[in-house]
Amino acid sequence: MLSRRDALKLTAAALMVPKAQPRTTRKVIVAGAGIGGLSCAWQLVRRGHEVVVLEASERTGGHVFTFRDPLDDGLYADAGAEHFTQPGYERYWSYVNEFKLPHRYYPRRDHILRFIGGKMYSPEMLADPKVLEGFGLNRREVEYLKTHPWPELASLYYAPYVDSFRDEYRPFDAGLNHLDQLSTIDLFRKDGASAGALAFIGGSGSALQSVWHAAILKLRGVPLFPPHVYRLVGGNQKLPDAFVERLGSRIRLRSPVTRIEHGQTGVRVTCRSDGGSVTHEADHLVCAMSAVMLRAIPVTPAWPADKAYALQHVPYYFDSRVIFQSRTQFWKRDGISPSMEFGDRELNHVWTTCDEVETARGLIVGTATGLVTPEAALAVYRKRYPGASEDVEKAHVVAWASNPWASACETTSYRPGELVKLWPALIEPHGRIHFVGAYADNLNWGMEAATRSGYRASEAIDKT
């Protein structure tokens, strides 16, 4: 995280950015300094465009935030975006390589212990036919899980549909539009899923959306639940900070947008600042804030009906990051995997991080649904952890739902019938206004969607 003072110190370095010759130099306002807005701004600057980035809060990075204080011994936790995959995240990886950011394999998905019906199951147990039959899975499902990991069960029912998608941005060309009227659980039930399986897979969202997302992953060569994930050494905020270092004083912190005006020849954006109200004029605007924040900003002329509906109705989830610092790495002493799924709202799942930090202490991080207290999350952990050596000494929660500028996390499933209303209206530019962020791409994986949409917007502006 870079403060305003730090950003201003980098002005001289920012002026040395190597620039490509654009077709026509454009003035661009980027509203939002999360990873999507920052990556878009960097792409525009390196193409020679004139850019100002307006950030409402006191820090850059948005949901990419590395938590350090008051942890001890140099420990840190990614309190927002937690990992990236390979394959997948191609645009994100391009920046990691460009800036030569150290990264490491993240074993958080190795040997996950899952609590089902109050009992702990290992990956080996969840491949045992007797265990699976005890859940009420049918013969076909049991056979499938003999050769596929437990989190891939839904792939059995996606398989008949995913090859119908040729262009990952054109879901309605697959000839499966009728699936938007079904929920995923109804589709799986129709296709023979057992009641036992439907306790674990499916859902109430649009079947077309979920099938499409599975198809996108297959086109990218990514499993439904990627087991191999990575993180940046020192915290995933290293990438937003690298953008900030290069953008320098183009970034204006504590500058929340209060009004957007647009026309055929340009845009006018009004924001608050330390000195009152400031208006910026430009050729283009990149809206790189969440749709939740964008809904609250007056726009003149108003959004067209399809864009207004999409921005108003795109659904989000709101999670909290739970962080436990322990006196020792007690799970090693107990011989127990630190990666666990509990399924409780107060603590859904946990894993360990910071294995490269030289300390006897341990760090367990996890996710809770909505707002939760450290005490409630720790109570769940102590209830579920099966070993005898647990010695958590500090518990913290980063509650995104209470953040005034970055409350919304990633988008979640659309209701049946909504995909045709939200796509592609949600991501399409409107005149000289472009849309960037975790909600503004075809797959809702935060840092991947943000960097992909940021690149797409920069390309569109550069080609005008």
Regions from the PLM with identified roles:
Residues 1-14:
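N-terminal secretory signal peptides and thylakoid transit peptides that target proteins
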Residues 46-67:
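Glycine-rich FAD pyrophosphate-binding loop
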Residues 154-259, 263-266, 281, 288, ...:
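Active-site/ligand-binding neighborhood in enzyme catalytic cores
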Residues 287-303:
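Flavin (primarily FAD) binding-site architecture
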